[in-house]
Amino acid sequence: RSSVHFYDPNTFTLTPENSDGKSEWGHTAAAGKFQAGSNEEHVVSTFSKLYEKYIMNNIPVYIGEYGCVMHNNDRSNLFRNYYLEYVCRAAYMYCMPVMLWDNNVKGGGNEHHGYFNHTDGTYVNNSETLVQTMIKAATSTDANYTLDTVYNKAPK
């Protein structure tokens, strides 16, 4: 079995507040606000390579850590939600379970990966709907719920 971490592109998922940080992701992102070469096609390409090299050779792969920090504005968080749903659905389509990284840090900014309160299990950062969306994306067997349906819901 093999485990990988997935935080591509880190300028969007981990360090959006840095000088080279990015506030948007995917095919609808505005020019200059996304990391070139690290959009939906990159996710599919990366997961496809893992699938072909390992899973097709009976070596299980799971994404042992992934996530995207809470950003500091609503528009950026729309792209965050889209990214997380897309990555989870792509992982499902390529037969890889996912494990969300949660460091219990509330609020927005670099390394703010809080989804649950580690003391009482409640949701933080208004993450309940997002977490339910990620669970659906990572587990749904609905044949009509595809990467294309997620792609077509990207923020405008």
What residue spans do the PLM features occupy?
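Aromatic-rich peripheral "rim/lid" segments of glycoside hydrolase catalytic domains that contact
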Residues: N73-K156
